[in-house]
Amino acid sequence: MSLIDTVRNTLVPVHREGYRFIAIFFVVSLALGFLWEPLMWIGFLLTAWCAYFFRDPERMTPIDDDLVISPADGTVSSVATVTPPEELGLGSEPMLRISVFMNVFNGHVNRAPMSGTVRRIAYRAGKFVNAELDKASQENERNGLVLETKHGQIGVVQIAGLVARRILCWTRESASLEAGERFGLIRFGSRLDVFLPAGAEPRVTVGQTATAGETVIAEFGSAKGPVISRRA
């Protein structure tokens, strides 16, 4: 095994979207070192933080069509019944919404909460208020996905925050996603909302820590014992 392979297998993987930012932080750190050496070391610490921010580790995803898995690392900021954003086309009936807030220290790779087919992708320009606030669901810049699942259509909404200024979504309409599969990323602090139809019961509470691709945030009916499968 080569040295590069050893390092790659030892360290937490970094998503390719972070390579450019890590390189910029590193080069700037070297440049600052010519001005004053302590600045270089501060820059290296920030470079390490940048790499940590874009971390993309493997996750053990429970595989069960009745389970809803957290789409993001972070803290559950809301569990409520609300009307979904109109651009999702999910109607005006209230749905269960579970929100996960990601601060700048959480990983920001987003994963599908259930297996299904992407029926709609809808982007909406907006503000950049604190993503922890309830009004962020309606006022902030956001990108929504509608997934056709065994239990009907669900909504997954990427919401920009105070610092976040770039929402990335790699999937496309008509694509099939598996539970826990990566579909997007939001840079530097943000939030994910999951909208679920009748029959879904929350399995998390406000303030609880959630792990993308692993934490069960809701379920339909009585889920059977989940099969554990490693995701790439």
From Swiss-Prot:
A single cellular component GO annotation: plasma membrane
PTM per Swiss-Prot/TrEMBL: Is synthesized initially as an inactive proenzyme. Formation of the active enzyme involves a self-maturation process in which the active site pyruvoyl group is generated from an internal serine residue via an autocatalytic post-translational modification. Two non-identical subunits are generated from the proenzyme in this reaction, and the pyruvate is formed at the N-terminus of the alpha chain, which is derived from the carboxyl end of the proenzyme.
Cofactor note: Binds 1 pyruvoyl group covalently per subunit.
Any one GO molecular function term: phosphatidylserine decarboxylase activity
Positions of modified residues (Pyruvic acid (Ser)): 190
Enzyme class label: lyase
Assembly and binders: Heterodimer of a large membrane-associated beta subunit and a small pyruvoyl-containing alpha subunit.
Cofactor section: pyruvate
Family under the similarity heading: Belongs to the phosphatidylserine decarboxylase family. PSD-A subfamily.
The UniProt record lists the keyword Cytoplasm: no
Protein name listed in UniProt: Phosphatidylserine decarboxylase proenzyme
Keywords: Cell membrane, Decarboxylase, Lipid biosynthesis, Lipid metabolism, Lyase, Membrane, Phospholipid biosynthesis, Phospholipid metabolism, Pyruvate, Zymogen
GO biological process: phosphatidylethanolamine biosynthetic process
Protein's pathway: Phospholipid metabolism; phosphatidylethanolamine biosynthesis; phosphatidylethanolamine from CDP-diacylglycerol: step 2/2
Function: Catalyzes the formation of phosphatidylethanolamine (PtdEtn) from phosphatidylserine (PtdSer).
Positions annotated as active site in the UniProt record: 190 (schiff-base intermediate with substrate)
E.C. numbers: 4.1.1.65
Organism phylogeny: Bacteria, Pseudomonadati, Pseudomonadota, Alphaproteobacteria, Hyphomicrobiales
Subcellular location: Cell membrane
Site (described: Cleavage (non-hydrolytic)): 189-190
